[in-house]
């Protein structure tokens, strides 16, 4: 039995924005060599949704960084812990226009994250590490973390017409 989720991730409320069937569901272990599996699955999905190459790269970079953070900080480097990734198509109306996007949900059962200790470090500080949150927040329109019981949930959202992250173009809108 899957330790994180059965059919619907625990702690996730059903909303009108989400259908019961996800476009993509991945279950993997917290081994860094599996990051390429996530990247390999997301790239054609983002292309299928019609995201431009720039958006595609930004989304994959953010998810890759988020999953790396789960492996390093939530699971403290343990290589056999479960991580689940769910992707779903989104749509919203803004200024009379329909914007299409993607929602990516990441679930793990690792240590809770103290969000008060997560401010991104100043970019002018020259030292390795600490840019992960900056990359994630700069690439995505919405970044939401929630702890529900023993489950961590990270919700990442990107819309095609977003100016955040400097990615994409009008022709890169999902169809």
Describe the role of every protein-language-model region.
Residues 30, 51-54, 78:
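Structural signature of the histidine kinase catalytic ATP-binding subdomain
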Residues 2-25, 71-175:
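Conserved beta-strand-loop-beta-strand hairpin that lines the nucleotide-binding pocket
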Residues 35, 39-42, 136:
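Heptad-repeat coiled-coil signal-transmission/dimerization helices
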Residues 66, 70:
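Hydrophobic residues in the alpha-helical elements that line and stabilize the ATP-binding pocket
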Residues 23-37:
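STAS-typified acidic loop motif
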Residues 40-64, 125-127:
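Conserved short strand/loop->alpha-helix "switch" segment adjacent to the catalytic nucleotide/phosphoryl-transfer site
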């Amino acid at each position: 039995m899957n330790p994180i989720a059965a059919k619907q991730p625990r702690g996730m409320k059903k909303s009108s924005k989400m259908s019961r069937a996800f476009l993509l569901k991945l279950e993997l272990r917290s081994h860094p060599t599996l990051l390429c599996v996530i990247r390999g699955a997301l790239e054609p999905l983002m292309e299928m949704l019609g995201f431009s190459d720039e958006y595609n790269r930004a989304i994959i970079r953010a998810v890759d960084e988020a999953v790396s953070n789960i492996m390093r900080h939530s699971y403290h480097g343990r290589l056999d812990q479960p991580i689940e990734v769910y992707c779903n198509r989104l749509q919203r109306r803004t200024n009379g226009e329909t914007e299409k996007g993607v929602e990516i949900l990441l679930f793990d059962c690792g240590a809770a994250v103290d969000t008060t200790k997560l401010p991104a470090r100043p970019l002018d500080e020259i030292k390795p590490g600490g840019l992960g949150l900056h990359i994630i927040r700069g690439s995505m329109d919405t970044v939401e973390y929630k702890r529900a019981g023993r489950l961590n949930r990270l919700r990442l959202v990107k819309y095609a017409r977003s100016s955040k992250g400097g990615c994409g173009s009008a022709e890169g809108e999902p169809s």
